[in-house]
Amino acid sequence: MTTADARTPASKQNDGTPDGTTPDAGTPNDGAGKSIGWHKGYVQGSRPDLRVPVRQVHLTNGKHVTLYDTSGPYTDASVDTDVRRGLAPLRENWIIARGDTEEYAGRPVRPEDDGLKHTSPRGGLRNLDAVFPGRPRQPRRSRDGRPVTQLAYARRGEVTPEMEYVAIRENVEAEVVREEIAAGRAVLPANVNHPEIEPMIIGKRFLVKVNANIGNSAVTSSIEEEVDKMTWATQWGADTVMDLSTGRNIHTTREWVLRNSPVPIGTVPLYQALEKVDGRAEELTWEIYKDTVIEQAEQGVDYMTVHAGVRLPYVPLTARRKTGIVSRGGSIMAAWCLAHHKESFLYEHFEELCEILATYDVTYSLGDGLRPGSIADANDEAQFAELRTLGELNTVAKRFGVQTMIEGPGHVPMHKIKENIDLQQEICEEAPFYTLGPLTTDVAPAYDHITSGIGAAMIAWWGTAMLCYVTPKEHLGLPNRDDVKTGVITYKIAAHAADLAKGHPGAQEWDDALSDARFEFRWEDQFNLALDPDTAREFHDETLPAEPAKTAHFCSMCGPKFCSMKISQDIRRQHGGSREEIEEGMAEKSKEFAAAGNRVYLPIAD
């Protein structure tokens, strides 16, 4: 099996198989019936088709730890997955049962949707067919024009199956989930056209989430690579994935990704719209953008980054910046505003856009197109002017029943980070904050996963709900498979550190389980409990490869004579004992003190 996510809302150390969970068919054992390693299990909900996946880590002391899992069916040995078929539509019956949506023909797929001219042959797909060959489907939308969003249901007092699902994942009551969504403090991205997802929630009362970016460009990558990167990212713990493709076959790539993704998929519709006008920002129109949004909503995109806060009056505020406008979406909209000397069409048509998103339950991710791209530009007038507009737009979106989160910076030194979260929470009425890092210094190309991981841990501790990962390739190139893993693991560390600092239920039990395994030299348990078991085992075996080293009471760093934990254990054995023995020893020393005349200091004998 491939290692899956290891964050936990309900990290439990129990004997045997936990109550309420069922193992998959591939549960490993030691030959004597005792489970070892880890396996995919499920927690049963209130209905037969509501089974929440968990990762069960079986310890060598007979206990187990239950961890949050994002890997989907790919790590369930009992499920036969095939990317050409796609995943099973987990939520389909829930959506149909609500009775407020309908199937319809949808818009036809056009050559320009894939960045192709009418006369161009379809090609460049390398190893995958041009059209997704899985089960045929028609798009679904609201039946009567009313919002079919989780926000609308929550406001009506309904606890949907999706809400129950995430409540089990987060180890909280379902009513807590409903209340947070209804108040706009959390979002549950779940397009009615993406029934394959395992529902998750983004909000500061819940586990800090991590997003991984994938996507092709005009110079590199293929559909097959992007599908592989998506499944790879989720197996290492990505809670959502954004497809930021800007090259050929954008529509087709997205279809393959959506049909195979167990997590919500986000996009930036502006990128595809720009491809439809051959990269000329000034030729963009509201009609082209609107059509692109509907195209993506029909496919099943769960959340969309919309740069509606980049307004004409704010563009001059960036003139004195060291690095100007670094957001792709922000620069596109700034160029359009200047070319036409008009207010942004995204801002002008925002209410109409709300109506479209509410029809499919697409969540807004209001983009920070004027985010700082260098430490020198952090927290400037342009950044905060846009933030105030995002606060206004958040209010409008909620009025239309659209779930909304707010995107944040960027490059921010540590002493300026807290101001960002404080202002966002105040201006945006505690809507979930979704930040890229922030990067805390500009001097480390090739190590920006570290510079940003520092800022990510800090801002998540103070309330950011989701972190957008940064890979070692940031500012340098398109990330490959290894870069994706490094980015996800780095940000999972930041997210879990924040969960610990916030006191999230169950967070520390995972750390305690690993600490116990470390102190007791249970090496296999340490590996299996680690965020990255494969690398932990690999590093250990580089210097102590022999199998007996897996049970040795030392590692290669200190060796057998200088291992601090072994010395601590020896002290316990030699000088420890029961409470009664300790108290008897203290009493004996008290008698010796009295017999010596109750003197604190005794003369040194010659």
UniProtKB/Swiss-Prot annotation:
Biased composition (Polar residues): 1-13
Underlying gene: thiC
Residues annotated as binding Zn(2+): 411, 475
Family listed: Belongs to the ThiC family.
InterPro entries recorded: ThiC (IPR037509), ThiC-associated_dom (IPR025747), ThiC/Bza_core_dom (IPR038521), ThiC/BzaA/B (IPR002817)
EC code(s) of this entry: 4.1.99.17
Recorded metabolic or biological pathway in which this protein acts: Cofactor biosynthesis; thiamine diphosphate biosynthesis
UniProt name for this protein: Phosphomethylpyrimidine synthase
Catalytic activity line of the entry: 5-amino-1-(5-phospho-beta-D-ribosyl)imidazole + S-adenosyl-L-methionine = 4-amino-2-methyl-5-(phosphooxymethyl)pyrimidine + CO + 5'-deoxyadenosine + formate + L-methionine + 3 H(+)
Biased composition (Low complexity): 14-31
GO terms assigned for molecular function: 4 iron, 4 sulfur cluster binding; carbon-carbon lyase activity; zinc ion binding
Free-text remark on how the cofactor is bound: Binds 1 [4Fe-4S] cluster per subunit. The cluster is coordinated with 3 cysteines and an exchangeable S-adenosyl-L-methionine.
Function: Catalyzes the synthesis of the hydroxymethylpyrimidine phosphate (HMP-P) moiety of thiamine from aminoimidazole ribotide (AIR) in a radical S-adenosyl-L-methionine (SAM)-dependent reaction.
